[in-house]
Regions:
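Bacterial N-terminal signal peptides
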Residues: 21-37
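An extracytoplasmic/periplasmic, membrane-proximal ligand-sensing/linker region
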Residues: 43-54, 59-70, 250, 256-257, ...
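Hydrophobic residues within well-ordered alpha-helices
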Residues: 98-99, 161, 212-213
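Short beta-strand->loop
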Residues: 123-140, 195-198, 231-249
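A ligand-binding cleft/hinge motif common to bilobed small-molecule-binding domains
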Residues: 107-121, 180-186, 211-214, 218-238
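Small-molecule pocket liners
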Residues: 143-147, 241, 251-257
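N-terminal secretory signal peptides that target proteins for export/translocation
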Residues: 1-18
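Bilobed "Venus flytrap"/periplasmic-binding protein-like clamshell domains
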Residues: 48, 53-77, 88, 111, ...
Length: 316
C-alpha cells in the first residue's frame, strides 16, 4: 500500500504541475499575441522624424510660404517634428508629392483634392479656413468662381466674349478650370474651345486677374478670394472689372494630410490649425488669408466637386 501511494504521488503531482504550466503558457501566449497585434498595428502607422508641408502655387509662392511660418512653428512644437517646406511647380506636383509619400501635409484646391483622393484614399481633408467678407469674397468656408473682363472694354456680356481670349488658371484648378468646363459650358451650350477664340492657362488666379487688367486676355475665370488678394496688393480694384458670371459656392481650399501618419501626429496637426485663432503669433497669418478661424472638414464636404468631376470626365 505504501509503495502504491508512493507510485501515485510520484506520477500524479507532476501531471498537475504540467496542467498548471499549460494554463499559464496559454494565458501568456494569448497575452503576447494581443500585445504583438497591438505593436503590429502601431508599426503600420508612419512616424517620420520630419513632416513635409506644401501649398498649391500662387503668384508669390515663396512669400506665401513665409507667411505660413507661425503655423509651421506651431506644428513643429505640437508634433515634436521638424517641418520642411516643399516648393511646388504646379498643382499636380503637390499631388505627386502626396502620392509618393514625400509630402505629408498640404493645402490643395478642391478639385486637386478630389483628384488626389480618387487616386489614394489615404489623402484626407481635415480642415479649411472660414473667410472674412472681402471685395468679392463672401463670408464663410466657401468661395465662388467668377468670370471677369476689364471695365471699359467691349466685353460686357457673355455673348460679347465669343471668339475672344479667355484665361484659365491651371488644369487642376476648381474655379479656374473645372467650373468653367462643367458649369459655365451649360450657360453657353458648348465647350470652351468652341465658344472662345483661344483658351490659355496663366498659372494662377492672381496672374489671370492681372492679365485681364493689362489686356493680355479678354476675360478670365478666377476665385473670388484670390481676386481679393490682387486688390489688397493694389494691382486691381473691384471697379476695374466687369463680373459676367458667378459659380455656385465652392468649399474652400482643403488642408490635408496622409492618414497613414500615426493618430497622435494627425491629432496634433489638426490642433495646429483648429486652435490658430487662440495663438497671438498666428494673427498675421490669419489676417493674410482673411480668416478668423479654421473649421473642421471631411471628405463628404467636397461631393459637389466630385459630381462636377464626374460630369467633366463623362464628356471627355
Amino acid at each position: 500500500m505504501i509503495m502504491k501511494n508512493l507510485f501515485i504521488n510520484r506520477y500524479w503531482c507532476p501531471n498537475a504541475v504540467i496542467k498548471k504550466l499549460i494554463t499559464v503558457f496559454s494565458i501568456l501566449t494569448i497575452s503576447f499575441g494581443f500585445v504583438g497585434s497591438q505593436l503590429a498595428m502601431a508599426a503600420t502607422c508612419e512616424n517620420p522624424d520630419a513632416l513635409t508641408f506644401a501649398i498649391i502655387p500662387t503668384e508669390e509662392t515663396v512669400a506665401e510660404l513665409q507667411l505660413y511660418k507661425p503655423v509651421t512653428d506651431r506644428m513643429e512644437e505640437l508634433t515634436g517634428k521638424k517641418i520642411q517646406f516643399f516648393m511646388p511647380t504646379s498643382y499636380a506636383s503637390v499631388v505627386e508629392g502626396l502620392l509618393s509619400k514625400f509630402v505629408d501635409v498640404a493645402v490643395l484646391g478642391p478639385y486637386t483634392y478630389v483628384i488626389a483622393n480618387s487616386k489614394d484614399k489615404s489623402i484626407e481633408v481635415f480642415a479649411t479656413y472660414a473667410k472674412r467678407p472681402g471685395h468679392m469674397q463672401e463670408e464663410g468656408p466657401g468661395y465662388r468662381g467668377v468670370l471677369i473682363s476689364k471695365r471699359g472694354s467691349k466685353f460686357t456680356t457673355i455673348d460679347s466674349l465669343k471668339g475672344s481670349i479667355v484665361g484659365l488658371t491651371d488644369p487642376g484648378s476648381t474655379s479656374g478650370n473645372l467650373m468653367p468646363r462643367v458649369a459655365f459650358t451649360k450657360v453657353i451650350g458648348m465647350d470652351l474651345e468652341k465658344f472662345f477664340g483661344k483658351v490659355v492657362y496663366t498659372g494662377s488666379h492672381e496672374l489671370s486677374t492681372v492679365a485681364v487688367i493689362q489686356g493680355k486676355v479678354d476675360s478670365a475665370f478666377v476665385a473670388s478670394h484670390r481676386f481679393d488678394n490682387v486688390v489688397n496688393k493694389g494691382e486691381a480694384s473691384l471697379d476695374a472689372v466687369n463680373i459676367l458670371w458667378k459659380s455656385a459656392v465652392i468649399p474652400q481650399d482643403p488642408f490635408v494630410y496622409r492618414n497613414t501618419l500615426c493618430d497622435n501626429i494627425k491629432a496634433k496637426i489638426r490642433e495646429t490649425f483648429i486652435g490658430l485663432k487662440d495663438v497671438p503669433s498666428a494673427k498675421k497669418f490669419l489676417d493674410n488669408v482673411k480668416s478668423n478661424t479654421f473649421v473642421e472638414m471631411n471628405s463628404d464636404d467636397y461631393n459637389l466637386i466630385r459630381d462636377l468631376k464626374k460630369a467633366k470626365d463623362a464628356r471627355n
